[in-house]
């Protein structure tokens, strides 16, 4: 069973529906005590970093997420859920994150329309089962005003261009993350969620 973490933000039902469509059972939870029961976790998200991390800490879910990851269980962060994995964000000031990955979350540079909303193509940098069946130039759906400016270049598996190169997929051990929304990315996104489900059996 895959747990979808509910902290008051994100496309929870869309993620749940997409997972079920590709054949995986999922349950939405806001109960920190329940997190340990899941084989894998997904942290989706649309919203402000400071608000999100505040809720995760207050509810005890932040600590349970860290325990889940430390145990080697599969974890997927989507959009804001990816950004929350980093050390800190400069959205609305400076806020510490979950510190799973090294680096910061910063605002997209001026020049292009902000927020970055819509379809953009992926450039695949490394092979991974997470991106099985995904090709260079495949389009996925983005909605964000901030991006990861991190120190995890060795773990970048795909990027996109929006005035600058933006990390689109970062994978480190059992932790998977994507800046785009697979649940909104049509057949390409469904393939990625199916791949994540298949990898749960292998990790």
UniProtKB/Swiss-Prot annotation:
GO CC list: cytoplasm
Subcellular location: Cytoplasm
Every Glutamine amidotransferase type-1 domain range: 1-203
Taxonomic superkingdom: Bacteria
UniProt cross-references to PROSITE patterns, sorted A to Z: GATASE_TYPE_1 (PS51273)
GO function terms (MF aspect): glutaminase activity; imidazoleglycerol-phosphate synthase activity; lyase activity
Reaction catalysis annotation: 5-[(5-phospho-1-deoxy-D-ribulos-1-ylimino)methylamino]-1-(5-phospho-beta-D-ribosyl)imidazole-4-carboxamide + L-glutamine = D-erythro-1-(imidazol-4-yl)glycerol 3-phosphate + 5-amino-1-(5-phospho-beta-D-ribosyl)imidazole-4-carboxamide + L-glutamate + H(+); L-glutamine + H2O = L-glutamate + NH4(+)
The EC number(s) this enzyme carries: 4.3.2.10, 3.5.1.2
Residues annotated as catalytic: 79, 181, 183
Keywords associated with the record: Amino-acid biosynthesis, Cytoplasm, Glutamine amidotransferase, Histidine biosynthesis, Hydrolase, Lyase
GO-annotated biological processes: L-histidine biosynthetic process
Pathway as given in its UniProt record: Amino-acid biosynthesis; L-histidine biosynthesis; L-histidine from 5-phospho-alpha-D-ribose 1-diphosphate: step 5/9
Gene3D superfamilies hit by this protein: 3.40.50.880
Subunit structure: Heterodimer of HisH and HisF.
Function according to Swiss-Prot or TrEMBL: IGPS catalyzes the conversion of PRFAR and glutamine to IGP, AICAR and glutamate. The HisH subunit catalyzes the hydrolysis of glutamine to glutamate and ammonia as part of the synthesis of IGP and AICAR. The resulting ammonia molecule is channeled to the active site of HisF.
Protein name, entry field: Imidazole glycerol phosphate synthase subunit HisH
């Amino acid at each position: 069973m895959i747990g979808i973490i509910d902290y008051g933000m994100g496309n929870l039902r869309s993620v749940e529906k997409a997972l079920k469509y590709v054949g995986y059972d999922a349950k939405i939870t806001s109960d920190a005590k329940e997190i340990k029961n899941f084989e894998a976790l997904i942290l989706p998200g649309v919203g402000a970093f400071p608000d999100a991390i505040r809720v995760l800490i207050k509810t005890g879910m932040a600590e349970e997420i860290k325990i889940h990851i430390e145990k080697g269980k599969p974890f997927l962060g989507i959009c804001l859920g990816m950004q929350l994995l980093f050390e800190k964000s400069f959205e609305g000031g400076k806020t510490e994150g979950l510190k799973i990955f090294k680096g910061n979350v910063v605002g997209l540079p001026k020049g292009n329309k902000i927020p970055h909303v819509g379809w953009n193509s992926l450039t695949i940098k490394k092979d991974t089962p997470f991106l099985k069946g995904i090709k260079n130039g495949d389009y996925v759906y983005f909605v964000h005003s901030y991006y990861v400016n991190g120190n995890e270049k060795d773990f970048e598996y795909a990027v996109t261009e929006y005035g600058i190169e933006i990390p689109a997929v970062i994978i480190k051990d059992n932790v998977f993350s994507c800046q785009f929304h697979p649940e909104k990315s049509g057949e390409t996104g469904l393939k990625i969620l199916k791949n994540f489900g298949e990898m749960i059996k292998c990790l």
